[in-house]
Amino acid sequence: MAADVVGDVYVLVEHPFEYTGKDGRRVAIRPNERYRLLRRSTEHWWHVRREPGGRPFYLPAQYVRELPALGNPAAAAPPGPHPSPAAPEPLAYDYRFVSAAATAGPDGAPEESGGRASSLCGPAQRGAATQRSSLAPGLPACLYLRPAAPVRPAQSLNDLACAAVSPPAGLLGSSGSFKACSVAGSWVCPRPLARSDSENVYEVIQDLHVPPPEESAEQVDDPPEPVYANIERQPRATSPGAAAAPLPSPVWETHTDAGTGRPYYYNPDTGVTTWESPFEAAEGAASPATSPASVDSHVSLETEWGQYWDEESRRVFFYNPLTGETAWEDEAENEPEEELEMQPGLSPGSPGDPRPPTPETDYPESLTSYPEEDYSPVGSFGEPGPTSPLTTPPGWSCHVSQDKQMLYTNHFTQEQWVRLEDPHGKPYFYNPEDSSVRWELPQVPVPAPRSIHKSSQDGDTPAQASPPEEKVPAELDEVGSWEEVSPATAAVRTKTLDKAGVLHRTKTADKGKRLRKKHWSASWTVLEGGVLTFFKDSKTSAAGGLRQPSKFSTPEYTVELRGATLSWAPKDKSSRKNVLELRSRDGSEYLIQHDSEAIISTWHKAIAQGIQELSAELPPEESESSRVDFGSSERLGSWQEKEEDARPNAAAPALGPVGLESDLSKVRHKLRKFLQRRPTLQSLREKGYIKDQVFGCALAALCERERSRVPRFVQQCIRAVEARGLDIDGLYRISGNLATIQKLRYKVDHDERLDLDDGRWEDVHVITGALKLFFRELPEPLFPFSHFRQFIAAIKLQDQARRSRCVRDLVRSLPAPNHDTLRMLFQHLCRVIEHGEQNRMSVQSVAIVFGPTLLRPEVEETSMPMTMVFQNQVVELILQQCADIFPPH
């Protein structure tokens, strides 16, 4: 049964747990994390969120425990399976011997640490400490600040054998005995067992001067050596009076290593041994540096910061379980160096804290939908999370690449910049595309913040909130109210996600070109920063798209609202209801539709508001000038005229009939000036800007331009066909690939250097098809229109000799370019016919192929079949009498 929460109630995680929600979001909780309780949904699941500004989610109720008021110091105690008893119980000790030959140096002195912390540990232990966050999330490695303390000098570790050591005050419930070790040993403090707060485990290190017990006789040949491990000191709940009492200052002793001669320092109270001098932090002891987040109580909160390892970004970060704050290692570099406490590791046989059973269901059965905040724009205003420790400018998204580099991606241009650092540690940005370097990321034009739409679960029912003039809404709490932050903070955190949801859309025109068919499809649509983006995949998590639209999916269409127009589509555009028509500045048109009239109305209002605000940012003259100049590389007059036109005569409204009429008149004025200054086609041809194409050009003009008697393309085709062989079956009868022929045609029209030996034109039928296409697209056929009737009349003559003589005289009367081209073509066709046995091309076959191409009437006649017969007979006669009609020179 769901129960409301009264007041600010917080819960503390006692056991780790991970799950994937129904929306695809992965949720993971770790011990010592604190969350704010929003609602006790069921007995198994509670609704919580991280403070401050995190998105709400569900966690198992048995894995957490409620915390009392924040003022109670006991709330900072770590979780435990049982409450602490009133009186301490007798201590239970677990003795075991650990062999770690690789831990100590050759003389028994501690190995030198190369990490950031100055404590000692062997290579094996250093590797274990690095992966501690993934192996044991409940035992993070904590960093401690050690204040300066007086030092009792000593000459070697042998002096420590005679010294009496007392356990540190407040660490154990009762006193215990310690063993004195030789130079190869160390002073080790007992560690409590995990069974209860009053039970302790003493890990005793073997003393080389004491004979081993009988049960460990097999270890005599391999004497054990001390083991050092970096283990977190778990904080304990204390009374208010004890918390206010000052901590006793530890005593440090100075010793000299016999092997290396280096001085090292030993603390008999804590058993810590270190190479680094503890006096370096003496100056900061009066006011020690706090954790990455400034807190009031240095003693209680300073040591609560744990060090963890992020597997995704491969970086070290810090986490405070009491405040729920996280920080990267970069933010703590300026603090004084801290030291890891050295204590023996837990016994492998010690029992662990049992976890409660897994809840029965993934989500409360009483809730059939996700929280309202999941689809609201709260993600766009959240604090930077662990994946983005630095402040990301508006319009940019930050992520870590596979090369472990910080990549910043522009939401609008998809431009990527890499964050690097110079030798002095100062960050700068590098663009791999143009090799440019900048100290700061390029600024993205972001419109002024306006009323934020808080969407419902489907992102389509916004509720407007009017922010104050001096403050900008930044966060949404659990009931949907706005938290207000200062303008300085809002300038860094505010982004411009206006609306998001699933819409039906189709594209009807692409840059002014009308598309034939409309393909309606549902897609996730995001309105952000004056840009409307339609994504391809609408099944991906909507919440992820709200946070990072560029990573959410591949954008299919991106429409810039600057200069766009929006209206309700008429019935002739679409038979659907609730259809919007959006026209962009580049001439593209889109239809947007939703079945709900309320939802489409909110989209209409949001898009129209974005268009109006973007139009108000620029002067009307500049907007119109950008519309006219779009896609044109020519200027519309001199710069003086530009400046004169750009002067604002009157502030015309962006909308309304008066503004539209004024805009149309300005457009007509611009077009009139453009047409008046437009050069003529003849002048462009004279200057060489425009050249006539080869295909479709008049034969006489082409020969004159190429200064040849036969077109160059005809000569190249004939030579290429004869070079590849005239014995190919179906030569000139079989058609080549039409797409390849069109590519060859484009190559001939736009490139003067044509190489038919290129591999793209290896098919001889492509070349023969291109040659036939050239003759077919001549404005006037090779037999001119003026000679058509004469050739038909000559072929109808019954006398064969007279018919041949008439045809010969007509051919010789043709213009020189036509006559010479006919000569070369028919002599080539005669050579093709000579190989008729191989290529199966007879005189009749060639005449049928070339008859309608070379000889056709200017106006189609009714007796088309008879005309085609006569055309073929004319070509057949010329082929049979080619030597007589075209005698050799």
Swiss-Prot record:
Residues 104-132, 329-397, 447-474, 617-655 are annotated as: Disordered. It is found in: Cytoplasm; Membrane. Residues 6-69 form the SH3 domain. Keywords: Cytoplasm, Endocytosis, GTPase activation, Membrane, Phosphoprotein, Repeat, SH3 domain. The modification Phosphothreonine is found at T461. Expressed in germinal center B-cell, spleen, chronic lymphocytic leukemia, pancreatic cancer and lung cancer. Residues 496-612 form the PH domain. Residues 329-341 have a biased composition (Acidic residues). Rho GTPase-activating protein which may be involved in clathrin-mediated endocytosis. GTPase activators for the Rho-type GTPases act by converting them to an inactive GDP-bound state. Has activity toward CDC42 and RAC1. This is Rho GTPase-activating protein 27. It comes from Homo sapiens. The gene is ARHGAP27.
